[in-house]
Amino acid sequence: MKFPTIKSKKDSLYITLFFLFSIACIAGLRYEQRLEMQKGIAEKIIRFHVIANSDTKEDQDLKLAVRDAVGIKMSGLLKDAADRSRSEAVIRKNMEDMKQTAEKVISERGYDYDVDICLTDTDFPVKTYGAYTFPAGNYEALEIVIGAGRGHNWWCVMYPNMCFSNTMYEVIDEDARSSLKRVLSEDEYQQVLASGDYQVKFKSFEILKGLYDEK
């Protein structure tokens, strides 16, 4: 591509400012688009969040044991839930049972920690599950807080099921992929089917470079 030659420093300044302004506008629009995309994704999924009492090995192991016990039960309860609304209703209906399940695991391991469990809106960082990267933002989640809740946490996507697979580990099987593709729009699905690298290459940089190269 042939670019016009910059004839003076004044021209150079004007052109630079123009392109910087254009880049800022494009970046702002893309940011707004990502926010809207995240909100759209959040409206269609439910996440699962377990917070340990502390970061000691014992408390972290306990967190995973609670995760497994609750996860196995919820996996069975949610397997026939047709949509997000139905999944939310099943979770709310079984909240007390899930709390008792967590308390039983804690007691059997010799601890007397309190357990708080709720379905709540929670801020999540960017999180990758296999090939899927979910943008940071606010999501509804089944949240379990063990004891003081000061330890590292664990999270996954509860609906559609992306974390319960027999042994409860994050194994994204074909059913999970199909379910996710079914509940998200094509644009939303392509958004999460990313590496997590959100860097944007603007054509403006190429144009600006070309202008200076031909000075």
Range-by-range predicted roles:
Residues I45-I51, D114-C118, A141-V145, W155-V157, ...:
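Soluble periplasmic/extracytoplasmic beta-strand elements of cell-envelope proteins
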Residues M1-S8:
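N-terminal Lys/Arg-rich, disordered targeting/topogenic segments
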Residues R84-P125:
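Amphipathic, coiled-coil-like alpha-helical scaffolding segments used for oligomerization/assembly
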